[in-house]
């Protein structure tokens, strides 16, 4: 994405009033669905809903994609992008590990 970050910035941060203005929301909604499905496979459907609410799941996923998006826009090099992406992923994965193993 780094080589196309100008397009990504337009898509995510500057698409108000276009058919793409809800792109990030769509991406987060897709992540919500796949994460909930994974939790259902791990814990069973009933327990998955007790592990984390849909609202909390959405907020955490939105924070993750927002952090990645900010990183794409602000990174000064591919190396910086990769290093910061690693930090973001490690941070969020540590939290998700708790919910995968409850």
Tell where the protein language model's regions lie, with residue ranges.
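Amphipathic alpha-helical packing segments from all-alpha helical-bundle domains
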Residues: 3, 17-44, 55-62
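Hydrophobic/aromatic-rich alpha-helical bundle segments in the mid-to-C-terminal region
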Residues: 10, 39-92, 99-101
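Hydrophobic core segments within long, regular secondary-structure runs in both alpha-
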Residues: 25-28, 32, 85-93
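Helical hydrophobic small-molecule/effector-binding pocket
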Residues: 1-12
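General N-terminal targeting signals
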Residues: 24-28, 81, 98
